[in-house]
Design a protein with these regions (language model features):
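Active-site-proximal beta-strand/loop segments in catalytic clefts of secreted hydrolases
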Residues: 66-67, 111-112, 157-162, 170-175, ...
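A general structural motif
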Residues: 5, 23, 152, 166, ...
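Structured segments of extracytoplasmic/periplasmic soluble domains
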Residues: 101, 112, 215, 243-247, ...
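Compact beta-sheet-dominated domain cores in extracellular/mature segments
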Residues: 3-155, 161, 176-178
């Protein structure tokens, strides 16, 4: 690979097989590839792989202060939190349009800490051009995070179980690690995984992770996460869930018991909408 935006897509060879059979054949800008420091083997649905360089100097997002990709512009580094005055070219609260290069995900939010109104944009297989931001984001973005997008299938496991032919897994906690074959999706089981800056830094540091799961059965006031710290109150849970927005990851709602979607989750969602 000579260009850090180039990729090789194999539709029917899984990441582990690519790593084991072909790893030694790849070079990055003339040097032998080193996994995971200079090369990535990302999932491509159930049976494929996207191979590309791992380069922290890559700038897959170009932002503009005018609509239709016009006006002053700035390049945003991958795997970096750009917020407030650290957004280049003095474009804090001035973003109106952007180009996101294929294979990447960008999270934009209005508050410098990542909370408040936000939106995740995904350029899965083609560059994404947004010529006009949604009204609530236009000239209001104060934090940006761009990370590699990983295209997993629907097949997953609850638990780090080998040999299940899945492309992602979770463990009801935030202690897991992705491997070459699977993306690990951390869960904030309860309040303890969402109440301080160390939690946020932990989630941000997860290699290959694009999502974070909300709380485990917070609707159960007598069991699971809902029995602790008044988490079965949807408003209380919403406050800690908001803290997870600081990760810049794509967020998944809390997982309630059967029937919670019509009651607890609905109430939780209404609080989230009210609070942006």
């Amino acid at each position: 690979f000579k260009d850090n935006l180039t990729w090789l897509k194999l539709n029917r060879v899984k990441p582990q097989a690519v790593h084991d059979l072909y790893f030694s054949t790849f070079t990055i800008k003339g040097s032998s590839a080193a996994y995971p420091s200079s090369i990535r083997f990302d999932n491509y649905y159930h049976s494929g792989t996207i191979i590309r360089s791992e380069d922290n100097q890559l700038t897959p997002l170009i932002i503009y202060d005018g609509e239709a990709l016009d006006g002053s512009s700035a390049n945003i580094l991958i795997n970096n939190i750009a917020s407030g005055g650290t957004i280049p070219s003095q474009l804090n609260d001035k973003l109106s349009s952007f180009i996101l290069r294929r294979g990447h995900m960008a999270t934009l939010a209005v508050n410098e800490n990542g909370t408040g109104y936000s939106k995740v944009f995904i350029a899965s297989e083609e560059d994404l051009e947004v010529h006009s931001l949604p009204t609530k984001l236009n000239n209001a973005v104060s934090v940006i995070r761009v990370i590699p997008w990983n295209v997993v299938s629907k097949i997953e496991t609850g638990g780090d179980i080998a040999g299940m032919n899945n492309s992602w897994f979770y463990r009801w906690n935030n202690l897991g690690v992705s491997d070459v074959q699977r993306e690990y999706v951390p869960m904030s089981w309860g309040k303890g995984g969402a109440d301080d800056e160390n939690d946020i830094q932990n989630y941000r540091s997860k290699y290959k992770t694009t999502h974070i799961l909300g709380f485990n059965e917070p609707d159960d006031c007598n069991g699971q996460s809902g029995q602790y710290n008044n988490m079965c109150d949807p408003e209380v849970a919403n406050g800690f869930y908001e803290n997870l927005m600081k990760t810049g990851l794509r967020m998944v709602s809390p997982a309630g018991r059967q029937g919670a979607a019509l009651d607890w989750i609905n109430t939780f969602n209404q609080f989230a909408i009210q609070n942006d």
